[in-house]
Regions:
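Hydrophobic membrane-insertion alpha-helices, especially the h-region
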Residues: 21-38
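Structural motif
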Residues: 39-41, 91-93, 129-133, 168-174, ...
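Beta-strand-rich domains and repeat architectures in extracellular enzymes and scaffolds
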Residues: 61-93, 105-114
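Non-cytosolic head/periplasmic domains of membrane-anchored proteins
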Residues: 102-201, 205-206, 212
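Solenoidal tandem-repeat scaffolds enriched in leucines and small polar residues
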Residues: 169-259
Length: 381
């Protein structure tokens, strides 16, 4: 007798097999996608950086190379322990001196700001509520605050000052040690605009107004004391930076003048200038201020090395962009040139570069030229 086949049952079985097969395919795709997502911090930076480095190591340009920065706009670069830290929109990339990528770390800071010393980098975002400190090997610590961050400062020994807004006071100052432990807090009645560490305390630059003009007042506090140790007289200028001197005094670079103070807050000397402040730097009790006179298409370099005398002045018939101090030498990014000077105003070197760069870094015998979306290394002339 012929075998009877249930056609309807057979069709149902085939449909179930097809549905099961489709389900397994979809499940595999979902699992693979989940695996990619959970491991994105490992593979995405590598994809993001494909084609980002162009090496140029021929005989004519020995030691030179070019890094292309993903995203370009608003990146920030500094050297930390001979490693180039490049802060971008979502990641911080760490390169060795030869342009080889050593590490890439994700951060969650919008419009991130980076402050560095010789060994570490402080990362935060203006109006954010968290900050972190990294070194070349790893992120060391991250802290969260209740109020929005105005700015942060990283000391040479790794201490961190964070200034936040406040609903009750003008602002709040938080001091952390090098391990991330909170060691000091202060509710401030005046608005802080800059902070410079000085021994076991810090010099705070506050801004206010007198007779309708902006003034800067310095206050020195010690972390073991609640009272302010000294307060300076008002300086009729908007402070850009305050720097601690080795003798316990301070040097202020303002928008219209500079000022020296002794270790009790008394004004020693000040110097007023006409011109717009472009850039400044300070190291080892010596300062450099770069000004521009737009109407004359002229730049002015002021060199400060002695609190008792006026600065050495150097003039340029072009608009310069950036000034750096390293090993007691001033490096100036001119229009299509890098110049170097001693603090006596003597020009030590000058060589031409592409004019498409906005900032210079120097590490060892190399210059690192920062442009819109690229970083070029070149030897110093």
């Amino acid at each position: 007798m012929a075998k009877t086949v249930d056609v309807v049952l057979l069709r149902e079985r085939r449909k179930r097999k097809r549905r099961l097969f489709r389900f397994l395919i979809i499940l595999a795709v979902v699992l693979f996608g989940a695996l990619l997502y959970t491991s994105r911090e490992k593979w995405f930076p590598k994809l993001e950086k494909i084609g980002s480095q162009h090496a140029n190591l021929n005989a004519e340009t020995e030691g030179e190379f070019m890094l292309t920065v993903s995203g370009g706009v608003d990146y920030h670069a500094e050297f930390v322990n001979n490693n180039l830290f490049v802060l971008c929109d979502k990641y911080i990339y760490i390169y060795d001196m030869n342009g080889e990528l050593q590490d890439s770390r994700q951060h969650a800071y919008s419009n991130a700001i980076m402050k560095t010393n010789q060994d570490k980098a402080l990362l935060y975002s203006h109006n954010g509520t968290s900050f972190r400190v990294d070194n070349s090997k790893k992120m060391l610590f991250e802290e969260n605050l209740d109020d929005s961050i105005w700015f942060g400062v990283l000391s040479d020994d790794g201490r961190v000052a964070i200034i936040t807004g406040s609903e009750t006071y003008a602002c709040c100052l938080y001091i952390y040690d090098a391990t991330g432990k909170l060691i000091y807090t202060r509710n401030c009645l005046e608005r802080l605009i800059d902070v410079s560490f000085q021994n076991q305390g810090c010099i705070c630059a506050t801004i206010g107004s007198e007779n309708g003009e902006v003034v800067t007042v310095l206050k020195y506090i010690q972390f073991q004391e609640s009272d302010v140790q000294w307060t300076s007289e008002a300086l009729p200028a908007l402070c850009w930076h305050v720097y601690s001197m080795k003798d316990g005094g301070a040097f202020v670079i303002g928008d219209t003048k500079t000022a020296y103070y002794n270790n009790t807050g008394d004004l020693i000397n000040s110097y007023a200038y006409n011109g717009s402040l472009i850039d400044c730097d300070f190291f080892n009790n010596q300062g450099a201020v770069l000004l521009k006179n737009e109407s004359r298409r002229q730049s002015i370099l002021l060199l400060f090395s002695d609190s008792s005398t006026n600065p050495v002045t150097v003039y340029f018939d072009s608009i310069c962009k950036n000034v750096k101090i390293q090993d007691n030498i001033i490096y100036l990014l001119d229009a299509g040139k890098i110049r170097s000077y001693s603090f006596t105003g003597t020009e030590l070197s000058c060589f031409e570069i592409n004019d498409a760069y906005e900032k210079i870094l120097k590490n060892g015998k190399y210059f690192y030229l920062l442009g819109y979306d690229r970083i070029q290394r070149m030897s110093g002339g």
